[in-house]
């Protein structure tokens, strides 16, 4: 038994070691010198026939990344005007404003993950300070005075997940409130207790509000599984994003569940939602999604959103800025009322440490005023501009606070009812906290944070367990009965993958303008740097290897070999890099034309912010990478030495990710080989049980919104079919265990062999080795399907 235990410990240690090696492979890649080109005589520096001479100097890969950054920033700036011009206007044949924005509301709800049905709650679950046992005062109240009492409560939201927080009960109930804390606050802080507190909840209760204060995801940071340091918010966001859910959606869900109960408790009374800082962000989203809310108060949050990419990553809503800045969200609350309280929000700086870096600052009064003017402008033709009001002065600075300003509260209460505001003014000391001595034990505050986090994490993991069935249902319309029916029925899925998951730039591409420069002169091949134009500011760059046996010109098969994370084309050509073993050069020596492109995933946070910027527009890194590859295959197909019907794709690691996505959307690639990456991709992204998961690592950009409900790697391989597809897999590769790889590949095998009747077009090679090119089975696969005998 001891021997078995020892073996298990050794196996687990080996597993973690391999995960460690895999996670640090990018660092090994980055350490290799950039300049691996031959030192050629000046007279030999010539361009490839049919191209212009490349004169660009310096690090072209760095310029490529910088150019894409400029391109994305321009697209973000342009989105402001696009959103304004595309906003619904009254039609000559009538129609209400609510009808005009109905689809926009549904689209926003989907983007923030409101895709699950809430549990019907019958009543609040009341907890006492001592776990539902009445205290020595004979009351289950956490605290009380002569105007109100405070209960600790829970309420069901989704099957298996409950919200928790405080319920502040006034002596006379005139309205209901969901008051959302900032992420630095516990519900008790809004009752005047502790550092960074406010008495907003007490003010609202003394005005007659039945106040619900939900627990929200905290900014608490810690190393997760001893690895990447991140907030509770990011920890939940990572899994949620891939599953088609979102942290913002969870908060909106629990607010809407609270409103369900408020409407049962006080069915004939108005309801408002309010919050400061992070609470303002959540309140705004709740006001958009729940039309039962009579008034929304957004404090310390409202302003332009074109720099959400620099904020904490849980603020990342895929496709947000295609339709929704804060102005559009504000306009969607109309014809109900919105009060914007333009006080500064929290100032937050989150260091990376493996998690995503992010900053929160402001907004200042001028930003809030600017966005408010935009919102009112959207409502002008609908004659609804009076539904949005700014509670503060039009000019000047406002004091920093930890809650809603007096002006914001006063304006909100007056907007609900002038009687409510006047009743508050009758209460002496309505901002006064409840004396600390009146509070019961507060030790449960941290316990509640952890319990809330763990319960929601368990809910997500249960969703992950079941998501395969959602995917299967999503693919029910695929028809494999004949090749023609397969081709027709798979196309809508390809379009969905292109438009909704990857994102497609609907922009005209520039002429190729190929520029080349000879950089390698070897016995069997020559190598050329290549630059192609894609969009304004966007280029494609790589190295083309041309076998000398192709001279005089003969049509050859071409292999596009894609490097991995933090890699460069030269890593695949020279110096026997431990991951690549000069695979591009090996293939050129076998007589293939080889192109090694530079992909965008280089320079750590520089490229990761490209993903953040892309996501806001409903795009991803691969939106731009695919546009680059479309130009690459167009140029390769035009080359006299390349057979356009035999252009193959082969990639390792992040290049393996590319091998699953690019050929699925670029049909000019006649086959695809995924090396050192293939696995149960959704599980690898969303699991908080497996040490292999990206939840624990520095790759905060890796997550793709709503992928899990629609596509895993087997489904991506289906988009590649009926073209040949292969997996190259080392047993010691730490990206995933063999069992997970085999499980997902079995689905691919079934599709090709059983459903399409093409068993010879797919295979997997298992070899004893790590995260590396093996170059045995894959070379045979290329030779077979490219109809080429190595020279």
Question: Which role fits each region the language model picked out?
Answer:
Residues 174-175, 207-210, 269-270, 291-295, ...:
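Loop/turn elements at helix/coil->beta-strand transitions in domains of secreted/extracellular proteins
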Residues 1-12, 22-24:
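Bacterial N-terminal signal peptides that target proteins for export
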Residues 174-265, 302-314, 551-638, 683-688, ...:
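Cap/lid segment of the alpha/beta-hydrolase catalytic domain
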Residues 258-332, 634-708:
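Primarily recognizes the serine-hydrolase "nucleophile elbow" in alpha/beta-hydrolase
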Residues 158, 165-174, 194, 535, ...:
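Short beta-strand-to-loop junctions in surface cap/lid or active-site-entrance loops
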Residues 31-163, 243-250, 260, 291-294, ...:
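Alpha/beta-hydrolase-fold serine-hydrolase catalytic core, especially in secreted/extracellular enzymes
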Residues 215, 299-300, 341, 598, ...:
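Alpha/beta-hydrolase-fold catalytic nucleophile elbow
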């Amino acid at each position: 038994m001891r021997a078995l235990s020892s073996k298990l410990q050794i196996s687990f240690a080996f597993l973690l070691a391999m995960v460690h090696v895999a996670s640090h492979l990018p660092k090994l890649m980055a350490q290799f010198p950039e300049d691996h080109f031959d030192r050629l005589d000046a007279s030999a520096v010539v361009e490839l026939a049919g191209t212009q001479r490349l004169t660009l100097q310096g690090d072209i890969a760095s310029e490529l990344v910088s150019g894409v950054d400029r391109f994305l920033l321009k697209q973000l700036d342009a989105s402001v005007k696009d959103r304004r011009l595309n906003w619904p206007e009254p039609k000559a044949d009538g129609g209400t404003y609510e009808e005009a924005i109905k689809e926009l509301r549904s689209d926003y709800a989907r983007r923030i993950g409101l895709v699950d049905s809430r549990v019907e709650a019958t009543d609040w679950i009341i907890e006492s300070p001592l776990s539902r046992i009445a205290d020595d005062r004979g009351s289950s109240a956490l605290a009380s005075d002569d105007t109100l009492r405070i209960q600790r409560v829970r309420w069901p939201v989704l099957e298996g997940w409950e919200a928790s927080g405080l319920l502040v009960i006034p002596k006379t109930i005139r309205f209901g409130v969901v008051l959302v804390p900032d992420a630095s606050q516990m519900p008790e802080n809004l009752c005047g207790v502790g550092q960074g507190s406010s008495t907003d909840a007490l003010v609202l209760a003394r005005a007659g509000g039945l106040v619900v204060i939900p627990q929200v995801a905290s900014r608490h940071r810690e190393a997760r599984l001893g690895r990447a340091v991140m907030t509770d918010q990011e920890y939940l966001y990572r899994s949620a994003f891939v599953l088609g859910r979102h942290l913002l959606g969870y908060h909106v869900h629990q607010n809407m569940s609270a409103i369900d109960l408020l409407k049962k408790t006080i069915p004939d009374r108005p309801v408002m939602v309010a919050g400061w800082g992070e609470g303002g962000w959540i309140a705004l989203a709740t006001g958009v999604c729940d039309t039962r809310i009579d008034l929304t108060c957004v404090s310390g949050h409202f302003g332009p959103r074109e720099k959400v990419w620099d904020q904490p990553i849980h603020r990342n809503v895929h496709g947000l800025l295609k339709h929704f800045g804060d102005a559009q969200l504000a306009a969607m609350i109309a014809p109900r009322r919105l009060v914007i309280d333009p006080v500064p929000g929290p100032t937050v700086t989150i260091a990376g440490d493996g998690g995503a870096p992010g900053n929160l600052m402001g907004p200042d009064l001028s930003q809030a005023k600017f966005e408010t003017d935009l919102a009112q402008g959207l409502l002008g033709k609908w004659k609804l501009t009076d539904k949005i009001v700014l509670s503060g002065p039009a000019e000047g600075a406002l004091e920093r606070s930890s809650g809603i300003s007096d002006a914001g509260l006063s304006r909100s209460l007056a907007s609900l009812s002038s009687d409510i505001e006047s009743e508050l003014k009758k209460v002496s000391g309505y901002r006064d906290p409840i004396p600390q001595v009146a509070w019961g034990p507060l030790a449960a505050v941290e316990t509640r944070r952890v319990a809330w986090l763990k319960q929601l994490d368990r809910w997500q993991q249960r969703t992950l367990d079941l998501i395969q069935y959602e995917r299967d249902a999503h693919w029910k319309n695929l028809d494999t009965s004949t090749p023609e029916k397969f081709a027709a029925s798979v196309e809508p899925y390809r379009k969905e993958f292109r438009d909704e998951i990857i994102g497609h730039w609907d922009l005209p591409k520039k002429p190729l303008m190929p520029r080349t420069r000879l950089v390698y002169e070897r016995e069997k091949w020559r190598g050329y740097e290549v630059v192609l134009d894609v969009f304004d500011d966007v280029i494609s760059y790589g190295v083309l290897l041309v076998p000398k046996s192709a001279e005089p010109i003969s049509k050859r098969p071409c292999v596009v070999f894609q490097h991995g994370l933090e890699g460069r084309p030269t890593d695949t050509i020279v110096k026997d890099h431990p991951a690549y073993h000069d695979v591009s050069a090996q293939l050129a020596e076998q007589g293939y034309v080889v192109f090694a492109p530079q992909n965008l995933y280089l320079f750590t946070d520089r490229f990761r912010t490209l993903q953040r910027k892309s996501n806001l527009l409903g795009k991803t890194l691969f939106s731009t990478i695919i546009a680059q590859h479309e130009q690459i295959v167009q140029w390769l197909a035009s080359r006299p030495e390349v057979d356009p019907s035999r252009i193959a794709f082969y990639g390792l690691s992040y290049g393996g990710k590319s091998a699953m996505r690019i050929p699925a959307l670029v049909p000019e690639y006649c086959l695809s080989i995924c090396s050192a990456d293939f696995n149960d991709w959704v599980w690898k992204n969303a699991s908080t049980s497996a040490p292999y998961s990206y939840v624990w690592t520095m790759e905060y950009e890796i997550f793709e919104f709503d992928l899990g409900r629609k596509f895993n790697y087997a489904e991506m391989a289906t988009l590649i079919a009926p073209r040949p597809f292969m997996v190259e897999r080392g047993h010691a590769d730490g990206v995933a265990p063999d069992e997970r790889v085999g499980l997902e590949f079995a689905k691919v095998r079934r599709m090709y062999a059983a459903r399409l009747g093409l068993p010879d077009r797919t295979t997997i090679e298992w070899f004893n080795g790590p995260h590396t090119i093996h170059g045995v089975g894959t070379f045979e696969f290329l030779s077979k399907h490219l109809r080429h005998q190595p020279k």
